[in-house]
Amino acid sequence: MAVQQNKKSPSKRGMHRSHDFLRTTPLSVDPGTGEVHLRHHISPNGYYRGKKVIKTKED
């Protein structure tokens, strides 16, 4: 089993753990339709930045 050579101080321990938190997914609302989608992704109805970019089954 590995044994530490030097004790990690509380400050260094905190710095090590500083990135362990969970991040929320960045959501955006399409201004034209009001659909919620991931930022920089096409909304479920085929719109990106207010323009229709792909055809969907409903079209």
From Swiss-Prot:
Membership in a protein family: Belongs to the bacterial ribosomal protein bL32 family.
Transmembrane segments: none
Region (Disordered): 1-40
GO molecular function: structural constituent of ribosome
Record bears the keyword Ribonucleoprotein: yes
Keyword Cytoplasm: no
UniProt GO cellular component terms: large ribosomal subunit
InterPro entries linked: Ribosomal_bL32 (IPR002677), Ribosomal_bL32_bact (IPR044957), Ribosomal_zn-bd (IPR011332)
GO annotation, biological process: translation
Database matches in PANTHER family: 50S RIBOSOMAL PROTEIN L32 (PTHR35534), LARGE RIBOSOMAL SUBUNIT PROTEIN BL32 (PTHR35534:SF1)
Keywords, in A-Z order: Ribonucleoprotein, Ribosomal protein
Protein's name according to its UniProt entry: Large ribosomal subunit protein bL32
